[in-house]
């Protein structure tokens, strides 16, 4: 089973006021078939942690690895989905999805075949030739997800991918993410500000403290796996335990913020 690990990582930035610690002694891992969600107040280092896992920046101390091999930069084994979809408006949907494969030297027929496969997976079959300005915000995020999936990475790293969507579209996208996870078995690391979203999607939930970001709690949750095993979403969200965990986490996050 593939595993992406951060071991005792810290990130310290230099500033005019002196050293600023964004993350302090954080250890966590994401394995195949897991959804690890990071939750915490703004500025707690969630995006910094994702940046380390993606290989966009090195830690000041500690180690990031995939299957024991050090992460020295971005790699095809880690696909990234951003809140801002970062699509290229001069390319149509299929060319956006296939762009990474094109940069890897994959031939046109092969990359388009792969792009069509992942577009079907994210329920965008039939939109291959549409321009980016012809599709909705939710569809744009699905294109971004398809682009990350096109290279068949072992891990998906998602930085608030649903944060800019309206409430109804966000609920549809949560279900889609779980459908994709169930179909692919990939390891997922996801950042969100939504407690309800975190409870629904996480198989492991990490609570980060306000700066410096430390993991102050870990929770194992089973709602995503219940959905993957066929339980209806309505049944899951109406479970009193879902509401109980949601409220307890809100209280915990409020306490963490008040203690700063």
Curated annotation (Swiss-Prot):
Catalytic activity: taurine(out) + ATP + H2O = taurine(in) + ADP + phosphate + H(+)
PROSITE patterns for the chain: ABC_TRANSPORTER_1, ABC_TRANSPORTER_2, TAUB
Pfam families reported in the protein's UniProt record: ABC_tran (PF00005)
Enzyme class label: translocase
MF terms in GO: ABC-type taurine transporter transporter activity; ATP binding; ATP hydrolysis activity
CC annotations in GO: plasma membrane
Transmembrane segments: none
Swiss-Prot/TrEMBL keywords: ATP-binding, Cell inner membrane, Cell membrane, Membrane, Nucleotide-binding, Translocase, Transport
Main location class: membrane
ABC transporter domain boundaries: 6-235
Ligand binding (ATP): 40-47
Record EC number: 7.6.2.7
Places the protein is found: Cell inner membrane
Record's bilayer topology term: Peripheral membrane protein
CDD domains cross-referenced by the UniProt entry: ABC_NrtD_SsuB_transporters
Assembly mode: The complex is composed of two ATP-binding proteins (TauB), two transmembrane proteins (TauC) and a solute-binding protein (TauA).
UniProt family annotation: Belongs to the ABC transporter superfamily. Taurine importer (TC 3.A.1.17.1) family.
Protein function: Part of the ABC transporter complex TauABC involved in taurine import. Responsible for energy coupling to the transport system.
Protein name per UniProt: Taurine import ATP-binding protein TauB
Classification of source organism: Bacteria, Pseudomonadati, Pseudomonadota, Betaproteobacteria, Burkholderiales
């Amino acid at each position: 089973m593939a595993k992406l690990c951060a071991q005792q990582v810290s990130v310290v930035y230099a500033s005019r006021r002196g050293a600023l610690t964004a993350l302090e002694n954080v250890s966590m891992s994401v394995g195949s078939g897991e959804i690890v969600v990071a939750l915490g107040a703004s500025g707690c280092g969630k995006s910094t942690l994702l940046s380390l896992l993606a290989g966009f920046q090195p830690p000041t101390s500690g180690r990031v690895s995939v299957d024991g091999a050090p992460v020295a930069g971005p790699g095809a084994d880690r696909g990234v989905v951003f809140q801002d979809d970062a699509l290229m408006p001069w390319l149509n949907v299929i060319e956006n999805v296939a762009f990474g494969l094109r940069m890897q030297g994959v031939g046109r027929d092969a990359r388009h075949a792969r792009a069509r496969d992942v577009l079907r997976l994210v329920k965008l079959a039939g939109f291959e030739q549409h321009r980016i300005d012809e599709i909705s915000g939710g569809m744009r995020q699905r294109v971004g997800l398809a682009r990350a999936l096109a290279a068949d990475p072992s891990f998906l790293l998602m930085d608030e991918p649903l944060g800019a969507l309206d409430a109804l579209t966000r609920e549809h996208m949560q279900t889609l993410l779980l459908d994709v996870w169930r179909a692919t078995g990939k390891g997922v690391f996801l950042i969100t500000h939504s407690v309800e979203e975190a409870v629904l999607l996480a198989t492991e939930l990490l609570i980060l403290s306000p700066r410096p970001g430390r993991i102050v709690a870990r929770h194992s949750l089973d709602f995503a796996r219940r959905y993957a095993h066929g339980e209806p979403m309505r049944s899951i969200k109406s479970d009193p335990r879902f509401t109980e965990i949601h409220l307890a986490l809100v209280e915990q996050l409020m306490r963490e913020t008040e203690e700063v």
